[in-house]
Amino acid sequence: MGREVFDSFAGFDDFLVYLALSLVLLALFIAIYIRITPYREFALIREGNIAASFSLSGALLGFIVPLASAVQHSVSVVDMAIWGVIALAVQIAAFVAAKLLIPSITRDIPAGNGAQGFFLGTLSLGVGLLSAACMSF
């Protein structure tokens, strides 16, 4: 019984490495994303702006889902990091695409337009799901 318990922790160091790198990539994504948007998501969310909450939540999930896929399918930590950065770039591209499709979106989300926030969040999540599926190599 003692050996079985010990063997269960055999991959714990890998778990910690992948988790730490995932959290670093998530923090990097948040830092970059909130800087490329012309509004202050966290301040807006604290004020109760549902549009900002929808858009940021969708972007976070749209990044986390492919990042989880990268963790699951990568052959090494470096491979996972590369695919994590690709997932980050895809989410930034999704935001830029939304801005091109609906130029007023960067004004309407801070104004509390829930429909626009929901659209951006859904677009981000959808692109993230597609990215995750494409990473299942």
Question: Where do the language-model regions lie?
Answer:
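Interfacial loop-to-transmembrane junctions
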Residues: 104-124
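Short alpha-helical packing/oligomerization segments
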Residues: 68-96
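Hydrophobic alpha-helical transmembrane segments in multi-pass integral membrane proteins
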Residues: 59-71, 122-137
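Mid-bilayer segments of alpha-helical transmembrane spans in multi-pass integral membrane proteins
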Residues: 88-97, 121-130
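Hydrophobic alpha-helical transmembrane segments
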Residues: 16-20, 80-85, 118-119
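Loop-to-helix transition at the N-terminal end of transmembrane alpha-helices
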Residues: 44-57
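C-terminal ends of transmembrane helices
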Residues: 30-44, 94-108
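Short, strongly hydrophobic alpha-helical membrane anchors
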Residues: 1-12
